[in-house]
From Swiss-Prot:
Cell compartment(s), UniProt: Cell inner membrane
Cleaved signal peptide residues: none
Coiled coil stretches, renumbered: none
BP term (GO), one: regulation of cell shape
GO cellular component, as recorded: plasma membrane
Keywords on record: Cell cycle, Cell division, Cell inner membrane, Cell membrane, Cell shape, Cell wall biogenesis/degradation, Magnesium, Membrane, Metal-binding, Peptidoglycan synthesis, Transferase, Transmembrane, Transmembrane helix
Gene name as annotated: mraY
Protein family according to the UniProt entry: Belongs to the glycosyltransferase 4 family. MraY subfamily.
Entry cofactors: Mg(2+)
4Fe-4S is among the record's keywords: no
Protein name from the UniProt record: Phospho-N-acetylmuramoyl-pentapeptide-transferase
Pathway annotation: Cell wall biogenesis; peptidoglycan biosynthesis
NCBIfam families hit by this protein: mraY
Transmembrane segments: 30-50, 72-92, 98-118, 139-159, 170-190, 201-221, 238-258, 264-286, 345-365
Length: 368
């Protein structure tokens, strides 16, 4: 909205300084500041409103340290989503389909997460929304994203093609498998972020790091000169995603102000599913989805720990009659909790690992 207003003023009256609205870096920075301020200013009121209304009880199977915590208001993801949506609405270009697809993903999976949280904390239905309905929501989003990008001429340049990290000379054409792969990536990443949201600040901080890198890739991919120099796919209009990325990053940072240990609020599935789907869709749109195992390495490790734990337990139970575990508890962050690591230490160390993955991902820009 502000973009079009300021652009109109600049075109009609040509006041000094208003031309800066055309610069992507300015609008990305403005979106970041707006998202941060909304989070910080609305946060205290929002927390007061949620207290006594939407409290998530501590799970019975939670580690002992978790059981010592007071029950916290959940659905904090609403604050994150609101901050993102408003800042993007103010500073991004509405006519860019990349922006709307990411916004659709955030709203869609945020709604699925909200229903799940509402069933758990208000209706007191154990487990919230059943896994099959969550999966249905993820598959539906994947279908919409996949079909839209398949048929919209704006995405016809690359469509089902993508690049291989570290080997830029090679590319892959998914062909008829494009839509199933889109569905798989959206489902896998959104679930991975959801599994990571188990300690104060872990999911929000890690997401901010991951999306920062995606923002850099988006900016470079949307510039024909930079894309050609770095040998990455040129995505016409893809630079506009950087505005969305910066809004996501600072909405997470603003939320982290209240979510850091000891947390005053948690994001719930409302936030984790929305953020996970955003990460997946952004990576797909800028053709960096194959980089996610590196860039989103912490999310991948968390998801793998759960898969390995379940499979190993079932296999050993079938072979010996008694199930065994690889980890003390899954996801991985709970394993370290039970080993005696302080929660703050786990979170900070996982952030450090995320930064290492972030830097490794940026290194791929110069590798031929």
């Amino acid at each position: 909205m502000l973009y079009y207003l300021l652009k109109y003023i600049n075109d009609v009256f040509d006041p000094p300084g208003f031309g800066v609205i055309e610069f992507l870096t300015f609008r990305a920075s403005a979106a970041a500041i707006t998202a941060l301020l909304i989070s910080l200013m609305a946060g205290p009121w929002f927390i007061r409103y949620l207290k006594g209304r939407f409290i998530e009880p501590v799970k019975e199977e939670a580690p002992p340290e978790h059981k010592k915590k007071k029950e916290l208001p959940t659905m904090g993801g609403i604050l994150i989503i609101f901050s993102i949506e408003v800042s993007v609405f103010l500073w991004a270009k509405f006519d860019d389909p990349h922006v709307w697809l990411v916004m659709l993903a955030i709203f869609w999976m945020g709604l699925i997460g909200f229903i799940d949280d509402y069933r758990k904390v208000v209706l007191k239905i154990k487990g919230g929304l059943s896994a099959r309905y969550k999966l249905l929501g993820q598959i539906s989003l994947g279908l919409v994203i996949g079909l839209y990008t398949w048929f919209d001429p704006a995405f016809a340049v690359l469509l089902s093609k993508t690049t291989i990290p570290f080997i830029k000379q090679l590319s892959i054409d998914y062909g008829i498998f494009y839509i199933p792969i889109v569905i798989f990536i959206i489902t896998a990443v959104s679930n991975s972020v959801n599994l990571t949201d188990g300690l104060d600040g872990l999911a929000s901080g890690t997401t901010a790091i991951v999306v920062s890198a995606l923002g850099a890739f988006s900016y470079l991919a949307g510039n024909a000169v930079y894309a050609d120099y770095l040998k990455i796919p040129f995505i016409p209009g893809g630079g506009e995603i950087a505005v969305v990325c910066m809004a996501i990053v600072m909405a997470c940072v603003g939320f982290l102000w209240f979510n850091s240990n000891p947390a005053e609020i948690i994001m719930g599935d409302t936030g984790s599913l929305a953020l996970g789907s955003a990460v997946a869709v952004i990576a797909l749109l800028i053709k960096q989805e194959l980089l996610l195992p590196v860039l989103a390495g912490v999310f991948v490790l968390e998801a793998l720990s759960v898969s390995m734990q379940v499979l190993y337990f079932k296999l050993t139970k079938k072979l010996s009659g008694q199930g065994r575990r690889i980890f003390l508890m899954a996801p991985l962050h709970h394993h370290f909790q039970l080993k005696g690591w302080a929660e703050q230490k786990i979170v900070i160390r996982f952030w450090i690992i995320s930064i290492l993955f972030f830097l490794t991902s940026l290194m791929t820009l110069k590798l031929r």
